[in-house]
């Protein structure tokens, strides 16, 4: 059952392919912020996926994170997530990323539970984000 307190941890090794220089988010050969964000989203997403009803999944809707320490290629990094709030279909997670020396990033991430078929039908042309009327919200799309 989906409930607050669900935790997850995933890890990876920093390689030349996920540095700021390689992904274009900077010029240095250190773990890229966009890659850390991806790790955080993936960690949160897969923590709750086993609890989704058939035909449902989650989509990311917000991130508020800080990247507080650089990590060179060759080190292991990992993310830990915890589901801290459930508000209808909106899920809020605390996310933290670490390397072998300590904390490298932290913050909050929100995801929204959606019906897969409905969501994909709407994103494939029946509703475009660029054509949203002022009164429409993400909830209207799912």
Residue ranges with predicted function:
Residues 1-31:
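Catalytic strand-loop segment that frames the active site of acyl-thioester-processing enzymes
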Residues 38-42, 46:
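Short, residue-level hotspots on alpha-helical faces of the histone-fold
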Residues 45-78:
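Hydrophobic beta-strand-centered segment that forms part of the acyl-chain substrate-binding groove
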Residues 65-100:
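Hydrophobic beta-sheet segments that form the core/acyl-binding groove
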Residues 102-106:
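C-terminal structural segments of small proteins and small subunits
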Residues 110-114:
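Short beta-strand edge segments in extracellular beta-sheet folds
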Residues 115-122:
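A short, polar/charged loop-to-alpha-helix boundary motif
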Residues 130-137:
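Conserved small/polar residues in nucleotide/adenosyl-binding loops
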